[in-house]
Amino acid sequence: MKSKICSSEYVRTVSRGKSWIPAFLSLGFFLAFPVALLLVVGNWKAARYTPDQLHLLYEGLWKEKLVFTGGAITIVAAIMNSINGFSYVYSRKKVDFYHSLPVKRSRMFWNRVYTGLLYYLVPYMIMEFFAVCIGAAKGFFSLKLMELAARLLLVHLLLYFLFYFSIVLVFCVTGNFLMGVLCLAGMQLYGPALGILMSFCAYGFFDTFSSNYPYGIFKALEDYASPITLTAAFWQKYEAGQGAALAAVLFVLTLIFTAVSYFAYIHRPSEAAGKPMVYGKLAAVIKFMVVVPCGMGTGFVFYLIPTSHARNIWCVFGMILGTVLAHGMIEALYQMDFHAFFSKKVQLLAAAVLVTVCALIYQKDLLNFDAYIPRQEDIKALNLDMMTLSGDMTDYVKEQEDGTFSIEDSTSWEKRENAFSGKDGIGEETYEILQKIVENQENRKFRYEGEQTEEGTFRRLQLGYQLRSGREVKRSYVINTEECGELLYNLYKEENLKNKTEQFLASDTAYLDNISFISGNGRGYDIFQDHPEKQKKLIEAVKTDIQEAAPEDLLALPFAELHISYILPVTEDIHSLVPGEEKPEKRAYGEINLFPSYKNTIAVLKETGYPLSFEETEIKKAKILYYNESGEEETAAEYTEKEQLEALVQAAAPSFGTFAWIEYEPDVAAIFQTEQGEECYAEFLKGRIPEFIRQESGSTDNREGELTETGNPESCLLYTSDAADD
């Protein structure tokens, strides 16, 4: 009997009337492989890529585009074959007929799996072989390409079984198509939806939650908790040649789906056909899995809508409403009777208790999320958003063994390889200031108009802890100017904070593209464009000054900013290939603050003849701007006397940027006009405003606490408050 089930004659017998399935799949794989390959290769030839580039692109084709096109048809095949093989379980007549045959259910199960596999595998292999032959005819053939084709077959076969058995499992535990469709949608979407809901709730109740950089369970649920998202993540890794770990996860998950669906099939009661759910205990579990998040989500929506202190009351109302509605709708579906909406009140009460517990975990922070900081000995390194902390927008540049460079922009700070660390983890003083920042978060709950009790300017700093165990923890802290300075000081003193800039400047000056600097007056100058020896001299001077600078030197007020760009050789990447370009290159960009202690740099820059600092700029007139409580310009005054202008220049900060470790006056600024008629905007340093300005304004500290967002609210969030003076 076993041999008969696997014989070609038996397959032809059971496939009568079903030939449209392999025919349809043959058409799909014809489009996914030969047609897609011909279209893409034709476009490459028209773009005039070099032969080496064409071979690189062709290898990438088998690791990227054909993975997607073939994968899409593979998923369609899994859906069609699973429906063809197991949808009969929803029909009482078909169940009675098939289960009356003298064939064991286990044999029947594997027969349907085997038949579906043939429907999928035969057209797949034919069309993939056809695509390989087309590539060989166009000059693309090697053992490596054959290996890529074989690996692609195995990858798609794994994806086929994953989706096939996940759908079969749904057929085996549900009794009608409506519930089957709902359960299948839930299987594919539940994990990501739950992850998003948990992230929203964490953002709403945990002030240190970093919503832009999910990690841990939040990232796991969003990216890996459903067959669809897990497959998408695997495709990305596979393209980069890093998919082995996720392939193992997919394989294990496929085995689980196979075993559970097999168990559910052979134990499925025949009389379950037509019923919404086959197994009562599973139905109860699914109900709780749906009702609890619905209650939480509805409560959170009602928590966000009001702006008054009654938001907690509305949150409770929303939780009750969401729990009752979700429970009632699911129960009505289970019993196929709307009168069952309020049935099973004990389960409704249990769900309400679970919703309450979850709400308390968030609202009361029972897990101490905001107060948590890893132990010092557990921390291996720190990831810091340096653009917020120090205004550093220098790219991450690292030279590879083959002489090429890897280049990532400053927004890549959260990657593990871009972390800062000392000789052995982080230093004691760095950890102490981090503890201080964490302890102060309780008084800085600014997201939902919490009570602000501190004065000063605040920024939101994104930070990541890399632990020795391999885990990572992401946080978003609100820090003031003093804490910015202390943290930077200790990072310079105990960690390798200088390394990023030093690695950037270590690039050979032969790759140098441009050097410019922005003076303290806000004007930019391209320098030494025709003197490469002076450019090299300047870079060496900056490198020397950075190495010799003490931490306190790097926390002074910068007098200018140096901009440097390199054009560096990089590894060939199919996504950035330029037709005909044999040696790919990429621009690396850096902005480096220049401090008064940089004597060597200053000496070289003086050769340009340009004014370096604000003090060296000839000022003709100054217009002082005063702002009201809303931050709108209220009054203005002009000054032209030399003594007054000198005093204003001494009190003004450079106009090329603001610095997190420097405190500024919140309600007054200036527009300076040079002798040449050029204007530059400047802020005033805290406590440095001349007396005649104070007399003119009456008070420079007249604005209430206000939240000001700059760019991304999660990366640079400013808050100016004078609460302590009240």
Task: Set out the residue ranges of the language-model regions.
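Hydrophobic alpha-helical transmembrane segments
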Residues: M1-Y90, S261-P269, F300-A310, I330-V346, ...
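Terminal transmembrane helical anchor/hairpin motif
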Residues: L39-L61, P192-K281, C294-V316, M329, ...
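Secretory targeting signals
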Residues: G60, V67, Y114-G175, M179, ...
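Helix-loop-helix units of permease transmembrane domains in multi-pass membrane transporters
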Residues: G85-L118, A273-G274, H531-A550, E638-K642, ...
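Internal/C-terminal transmembrane anchor helices
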Residues: V290-V291, L333-F369
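Membrane-interface segments at or immediately adjacent to transmembrane helices
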Residues: Y362-T453
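Short, structured surface segments that line ligand/substrate-binding pockets
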Residues: E442-T481, A550-E585, T658-F684
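Conserved small/polar residues in nucleotide/adenosyl-binding loops
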Residues: Y719-D726
